[in-house]
Amino acid sequence: MEFDTIAAISTPPGEGAIAIIRLSGPEAIQIADRIFYAKNSLSEAESHTIHYGHIKEDGEVIEEVMVTVMRAPRTFTREDVVEINAHGGIVSVNRVLQLLLRNGANLAEPGEFTKRAFLNGRIDLSQAEAVMDLIRAKTDRAMGVAIRQMDGNLSRLIRNLRQEILDALAQVEVNIDYPEYDDVEEMTQRMLLEKTELVRASVEQLLRTASQGKILREGLATAIIGRPNVGKSSLLNQLIQEEKAIVTDIAGTTRDIIEEYVNVRGVPLRLIDTAGIRETEDIVEKIGVERSRKALADADFILLVLNQNEELTVEDEALFEAAAGHNYVVVLNKTDLETKLDIDRVRELAGENPIVSTSLVNDEGLEALEEAIKTLFFAGDIDAGDATYVSNVRHIALLHQALEALNGVTTGIQLGMPVDIVQIDMTRAWDLLGEITGDSVQDELLDQLFNQFCLGK
């Protein structure tokens, strides 16, 4: 498969030390050579070499560059690739790009370089999606999961499962088409059930990693809730180690939602500091309270902050009711002051949810809180080693559908259905697993997936 030659700026826009303009396609080297001036021609350059020179437009030098030449097929796209390393400005880099476009290159679509790597067989679809996961990773663990997926861990596992299914389907087909041959091993219902159970167990094992994998990939939407002036903004500032939220003794200081990402011992949290939830006549504060209620409803995880120096109120108890059904940790703040809170009642309301005491003004209790968060979501252990996580929502949905199809095979066999009937569900499971790696996928889906990428990737 041969495409046209594309070009795009691969580095973020703005000022910086270096900017990279990337070309890929059959004319990549020739197009770059038309605007590059140096001692030797790029067209004569060996693969994987770097060359110093200048970019000229109408005889005028517009950039001093280093150009990397990489010849097919030993490139990311398996096409000829040229990368022009220029100074990280806005004007000069765009002039170089426009010059390339005028000399025959087409502007790349978002994700088109990675899409070509997939279409040319360099990577499969799950590996392509892992590229974006790596770019978006918020923690070292999320980065590790993405790198292992890019390396093909998930792909190999899925392909092995598809091969198991294919072997069984082939045996069934032989039995159906050539029943008269004595030397053909009969695929009995028991044998098919054993094959199915083997694949089904592996799919279930993958799905058991889904909740942790999704957390690592997307982070937890974490609402910090509580009545006004209990220490919510102080908690946000402590967790992100920055004075992001205004902290005063005046109740109702936080009027709007503040969001920040933070890595808590490998657990990525999208912290949402909400306005204190209370009845108020202040129009602006009332809007903030309504937004807080929505953030609470949409949260994956809640930090419910109470003031240990005040008695428990009806509003506090209402927060426990609102948090019901969510994972949450109760934070008893201001332990440096006299305890007036009914701790036994708090334990009763919290049930099995962890309770942590803090004095944020004295930097006390934060380590215990971080440990409680890690333990709540990863049972205290997030070191997965070389374990294969499934974290992509699309992959998870396809695995659930494949599991449903495999369950259909098992049910059909148990009901005594003929093998050639239950193979329909077996074939469906094979197709669904193939959608994960891109072995069976629609063009419309490919366009949708790669359009999520940035330009130049």
From Swiss-Prot:
Keywords: Cytoplasm, GTP-binding, Hydrolase, Magnesium, Metal-binding, Nucleotide-binding, Potassium, tRNA processing. One of its GO terms (biological process) is tRNA methylation. Residues 219-378 form the TrmE-type G domain. Belongs to the TRAFAC class TrmE-Era-EngA-EngB-Septin-like GTPase superfamily. TrmE GTPase family. Homodimer. Heterotetramer of two MnmE and two MnmG subunits. NCBIfam families: mnmE_trmE_thdF, PRK05291.1-3, small_GTP. This is tRNA modification GTPase MnmE. It comes from Listeria monocytogenes serovar 1/2a (strain ATCC BAA-679 / EGD-e). The gene is mnmE.
